[in-house]
């Protein structure tokens, strides 16, 4: 029999945290949302709207928000952690003494930690080893989830029974989690696609055409697959919702923070200019260097991610980055992807 999860805490009052709190209320759960900014919590409670991060979306009146982390966690039977990837370690360190017993943690952040190269589940296990762990990932825009538009995601947990219990707790008619036991696969797809989305945005901003973007998406999926398989992920996860599905969504829409950032770079704007106009985080900016370092550690070729890391770090301009990709040797597709060497021509008599 699956355990029953009724009381959910959501750590993170941004767009995605608010959307997950809203869909959890639709699933009939008691929900407390923690927002770092007291004014965000006050606005949600007073107006049933998050005007800073999800303006115009009406929230369930039963959704309670607080800026007091202890209050948010008290009595929770599951905790959704919805903070930027690079903030996960400090957020969990603060939450650790307040954690509600052995309540499972569902990580909803997508990225790789800078410096350590750790996946989000590895960070969580290091800080809170006693908390059962799951990962929620997939093709999602926060506003559409909050508005109740049809969405499907992967919910991965090494404990299959817990994965199913969380699916039952969070699932609704329009929010469809699919249970998986492949945590690594769910994480790698969700992290790397943010870097690839920046690349696709650059291609769009430069006006290189649909052919180029399709090629970049396909070769980007090959990079996700190479890294994921090296780390132990299953191929079907990488070609599923949290891999290919998330890549298609994030790398083809201006709703994506990462795609729109890449588009602006392709149009000639600087990274500082683009980031200076934003309040929300484009995770690919921080994940690029960590993914490239992780790939180097495992001797995995990821030329698209490396090119975008070069752009973000100031080593290349966008035109040079694209040129570096186009000048790579021709290869066999699939398998070992061995390089094709030209055969020297011999003169005919």
Swiss-Prot record:
Active site positions: 193
Catalytic activity: sn-glycerol 3-phosphate + NAD(+) = dihydroxyacetone phosphate + NADH + H(+); sn-glycerol 3-phosphate + NADP(+) = dihydroxyacetone phosphate + NADPH + H(+)
Binding site for sn-glycerol 3-phosphate: 110, 138, 140, 193, 246, 256-258
Compartments where located: Cytoplasm
Top class in the EC scheme: oxidoreductase
Binding, NADPH: 16, 36, 110, 142, 257, 281, 283
Homology family: Belongs to the NAD-dependent glycerol-3-phosphate dehydrogenase family.
PANTHER family in the record: GLYCEROL-3-PHOSPHATE DEHYDROGENASE (PTHR11728), GLYCEROL-3-PHOSPHATE DEHYDROGENASE [NAD(+)] 2, CHLOROPLASTIC (PTHR11728:SF1)
Name this protein carries in UniProt: Glycerol-3-phosphate dehydrogenase [NAD(P)+]
Species in which this protein is naturally found: Rhodospirillum rubrum (strain ATCC 11170 / ATH 1.1.1 / DSM 467 / LMG 4362 / NCIMB 8255 / S1)
């Amino acid at each position: 029999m699956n355990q029953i999860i009724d009381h959910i805490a959501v750590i993170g009052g941004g767009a995605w945290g608010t959307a997950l709190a809203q869909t959890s209320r639709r699933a009939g759960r008691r929900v407390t949302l923690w927002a770092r900014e007291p004014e965000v919590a006050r606005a949600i409670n007073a107006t049933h709207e998050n005007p800073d991060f999800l303006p115009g979306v009406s929230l369930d009146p039963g959704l309670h928000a607080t800026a007091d982390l202890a209050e948010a966690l008290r009595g929770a039977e599951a905790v959704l952690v919805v903070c930027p990837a690079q903030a996960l370690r400090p957020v969990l360190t603060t939450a650790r003494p307040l954690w509600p017993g052995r309540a499972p943690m569902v990580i909803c952040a997508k990225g790789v930690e800078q410096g350590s190269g750790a996946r989000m589940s590895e960070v969580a296990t290091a800080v809170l080893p006693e908390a059962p762990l799951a990962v929620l990932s997939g093709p999602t825009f926060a506003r559409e989830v909050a508005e109740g538009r049809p969405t499907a995601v992967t919910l991965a947990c090494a404990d299959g029974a817990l994965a199913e219990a969380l699916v039952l707790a969070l699932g609704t008619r329009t929010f469809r989690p699919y249970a998986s036991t492949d945590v690594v696969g769910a994480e790698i797809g969700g992290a790397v696609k943010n870097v690839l989305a920046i690349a696709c945005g650059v291609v769009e901003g430069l006006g290189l055409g649909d052919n180029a973007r399709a090629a970049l998406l396909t070769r980007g999926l090959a990079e996700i697959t190479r890294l994921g398989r090296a780390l132990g992920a299953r191929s079907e996860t990488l070609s599923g919702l949290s891999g290919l599905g998330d890549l298609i969504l994030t790398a083809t829409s201006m709703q994506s923070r990462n795609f729109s950032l890449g588009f602006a770079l392709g149009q000639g704007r600087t990274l500082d200019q683009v980031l200076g106009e934003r309040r929300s985080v484009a995770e690919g900016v921080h994940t690029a260097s960590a993914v490239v370092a992780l790939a180097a550690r495992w001797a995995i070729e990821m030329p698209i991610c490396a090119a975008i890391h070069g752009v973000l770090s100031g080593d290349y301009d966008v035109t040079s980055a694209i040129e570096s990709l186009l000048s790579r040797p021709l290869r066999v597709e699939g398998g070992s992807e061995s390089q094709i060497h030209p055969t020297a021509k011999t003169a005919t008599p």
